[in-house]
């Protein structure tokens, strides 16, 4: 007996990240190889023709799991009964644009989208914000959706997590799949803190294996933090395929579980680890039965506290920068 289709809303559907994302969702990579999906695609009126072109390509793949596609420029149509909402579209920073201008331009988008989710989405909708500044955009959407549980709103730090895994595998010579218990704390920005103090590879402590504080401080942390900028420098375009891959990882793990393994998600704080409530902050989590649970009780040393407070300061500044736009 075929499962009933799940509705997956994707914003910024004509964009580069969505182009890497939609075909994988339709192929079953997001919700499982036995789960039919209906894609509900949102983009601006001027992008509708481009979205139609992407849908022509989706049709031409003849994906067995793709049960339907909706194309719209209306958030209330896109989010209607959505089980998953991937908020990929955001206002990019243009030349000469101040960060506060970027924040307010995005606040406008995410208040509208949060309100639409509040009105029409499934009450169990799983929301992942990919569009930057992702943590604060997720915070704005959450605050604009008072009837939905706060825990439904998350921001993507999985790209930072995967970038850190790759750097650790290269440094230690261990297979990337063998590395467990990595944490990435804070904002999806160069201030975030990738933390491998608890990490193991094939049961061995990575900290002991690598045993190089200078590398951690001067190479590892900045490399992960500035990787997005390095890709733009090399490619002339921002990371799209790796961002789409991280979005798939994030939602798949949230829905299908992590088998006891740690992953990083930006989630609303409950006050633990000294992070004020409701701030959307990257923490290590374990997922099971469609829920995430933060890893509790980790020891925070002085260096880590400084790094975690630094990225928190940026998030508080962003929050305060949009406070007047939230009723």
UniProtKB/Swiss-Prot annotation:
Coiled-coil region: none
HAMAP family: Malate_dehydrog_2
Name of this chain's protein: Malate dehydrogenase
Molecular-function annotations in GO: L-malate dehydrogenase (NAD+) activity
Catalytic activity: (S)-malate + NAD(+) = oxaloacetate + NADH + H(+)
Function field: Catalyzes the reversible oxidation of malate to oxaloacetate.
Pfam families in the cross-refs: Ldh_1_C (PF02866), Ldh_1_N (PF00056)
Catalytic class of the enzyme: oxidoreductase
Record-listed NAD(+) binding positions: 12-18, 106, 113, 130-132
Disulfide bonds: none
CDD domains: MDH_chloroplast-like
GO annotation (BP), single: malate metabolic process
UniProt record similarity statement: Belongs to the LDH/MDH superfamily. MDH type 2 family.
Keyword Metal-binding part of the UniProt annotation: no
InterPro entries membership: L-lactate/malate_DH, Lactate/malate_DH_C, Lactate/malate_DH_N, Lactate_DH/Glyco_Ohase_4_C, Malate_DH_type2, NAD(P)-bd_dom_sf
Phylogenetic lineage: Bacteria, Pseudomonadati, Pseudomonadota, Betaproteobacteria, Burkholderiales
Active site (record annotation): 188
UniProt entry keywords in alphabetical sequence: NAD, Oxidoreductase, Tricarboxylic acid cycle
EC id: 1.1.1.37
Positions bound to substrate: 93, 99, 132, 163
SUPFAM superfamilies: LDH C-terminal domain-like (SSF56327), NAD(P)-binding Rossmann-fold domains (SSF51735)
Family matches, as NCBIfam families: MalateDH-SF1, PRK05442.1
